[in-house]
């Protein structure tokens, strides 16, 4: 059904490679093209994945783009490229470094795969999605950030752990930015259709909300030398599949807002309908006053990052 579909993945580290592996095992597309500065590493991973695909009789080919020019005519491009935060590096330093990496990468995507849908995974996620949108010149429906599916999955996992039942039947809902200011919505979270608020006390729900906000940091604390990649990669692969298969399913994703939820010129996580044209529709759900305040705070955190980029003349042309 998906013969001929091409997916480019820029950044073949843990997240990028695991996205590729997940898609290859499912046979979601005809070809996956890895692009990484470490070309030999990318080639080794591509060979390994191609052989794994052969083992499960998947038709998917995994190849390597030695140059951006080899990343042509992709239907979807996943961007995971970026620098981790190193000792002595401020958050603003990291923001500028990754914004410049994103700018370079997106210029190549816009040139060689001008009809692609871009899925951003690089951090800080919401700000990098904003950069990708501005630098590509694409319609906002074709530049989407991966965050909400991951954060919702983390919340669902914590709910199952706390309850001790309901695995596979939990629908957790998270909005807002991918960070400390995300907005987990217990009111819209259910277990087999039963509202979470009927199954847990307010204090238990608050514990889960706090743990969800710190979900990534909790994993880093255990790993010591790395960060999460299985769940982020699976969340990304789900987005790719929804687009390639034109499922029209609703998923929480980071998109550019133009008045939705009362906010504009900012990227934040909201429910969207994913299909062949990307984020085809933004779903506006009703929020109570406290949820609106939390969502506004989340958007303002992203605006602070955008302001930092503007102060550094990042978007000025010709410099």
Swiss-Prot record:
Alphabetical list of InterPro entries matching this protein: L-lactate/malate_DH, Lactate/malate_DH_C, Lactate/malate_DH_N, Lactate_DH/Glyco_Ohase_4_C, Malate_DH_type3, NAD(P)-bd_dom_sf
UniProt EC number: 1.1.1.37
Amino acids binding NAD(+): 11-16, 36, 98, 121-123
GO terms classed as biological process: lactate metabolic process; tricarboxylic acid cycle
A single GO molecular function term of this UniProt record: L-malate dehydrogenase (NAD+) activity
Catalytic activity entry: (S)-malate + NAD(+) = oxaloacetate + NADH + H(+)
Keywords: NAD, Oxidoreductase, Tricarboxylic acid cycle
Active site per the UniProt annotation: 178
Amino acids binding substrate: 85, 91, 123, 154
NCBIfam families from the UniProt entry: MalateDH_bact, PRK06223.1
The protein's name: Malate dehydrogenase
